[in-house]
Amino acid sequence: MRVVFLGLSITSSWGNGHATTYRGLVRELARRGHQVTFLERDVEWYRSNRDMPEPEGCETLLYSTLDELRAEHAARVRDADVVVVGSYVPQGVAVGAWACDTARGLVAFYDIDTPVTLAKLARGDYEYLTPALVARYGLYLSFTGGPTLRRLEREFGSPMARALYCSVDPALYFPEDVPARYDLGYMGTYSDDRQPTVDR
């Protein structure tokens, strides 16, 4: 399959947890024989902090403006079997609507921030997604599973919401034979809204 991602950033993990998820995902898609292109908005804060300018498993192409994205990459998006638009993409509503209008294949939304996204939608903050756009995506991939998926379908009109959880990159993280020091461990991204629960 030809897969095109329009994501926040894959070239810089600076203040951006999305990069780690995308890097492992595209590498594994390529390993399975898929052709992957990642389209990334070239913004100064990531440009100044690129820790992986050429990620393994995909062709990474940068664009500076929405007009440049449309002019330079319409054929890639149109001809892709799957187009995946990620959460927090700059001008995400316009990018998502353009992808839905342009692509002939499936257009999916990959929400790496589902609780944040739902809170933003509830307060009318449409930074990268609107309720109407949820219904236009053929597939809604969410870091959150369970009843949230049904809510995305019933309340927001997603034709198909499925979990695609954050994953551990097995090339970087794997079991090792070391003595156990703890009975229980927790590894997660720090977030002010989750920390009180973790501290209990």
Where are these regions (language model features)?
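Short hydrophobic "strand-cap" motifs at the C-terminus of beta-strands
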Residues: 6, 143, 187-189
